[in-house]
Structure formats: C-alpha cells, structure tokens
Amino acid sequence: MITCYLRYTIDPYQLEAFERYSRMILPLAAEYGGVHHGAFLPHEGPNNIAVHLFSFPSLAEYERYRTAVREDEVAKAAWRLAEETRCILSFERSFMRPMFANEP
C-alpha cells in the first residue's frame, strides 16, 4: 500500500472555496480503487496549509487513478473551482509507506 500525502498551500481568504473543492475531490479516490483518509484544514498554526491523505494498493493503482480522474467530470469541476477562486496557491505530492503498530 502507498499513501499519498498532498500538502497544499492555500489562500486563507479562500478557505470556504478550498473546502468546496475538497468535498468534491474526497469521494473520487474510493470511486477509482483507493481510500481517502480525509482533508485536514488549518486550525492552529499556519493558516495557509492544508493536507489530503489517500491510499492505493500500489503506485500502479494510483497511476491508473490519475489517468482516469483526468476525464472525470466532478474532478474537472473541482479543478475549475480551484482555478477560478485561486484557493490553491501550490501543492506538493509525496508518497509514503504506512506502518501500523500491529505489523511486524
């Protein structure tokens, strides 16, 4: 399993727009074979950092998701919203291997 850690730098004055974007994007991972662990929005600390975490069985499955989502109408609408509102200033994508307490 791989987990994608997607760190956004957002416009804090467009937080509501970013929340709308997130609500549109969140269900898509599950529709294409992954698990979305949620959107994590600013609360304490920097007011311009948000994170999405989602997992796929493999990097190959994630790449299939990336290909499929490019044609998804909900994803296209979310990206348009982000572009029009400029709620996302930049983002960084990292891939991690989860480790759980009950695993050797």
Regions found by a protein language model. Give the residues of each.
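Short, structured motif recognition centered on aromatic/hydrophobic residues
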Residues: 2-7, 18, 29, 50-53
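N-terminal secretory/targeting leader peptides
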Residues: 40-43
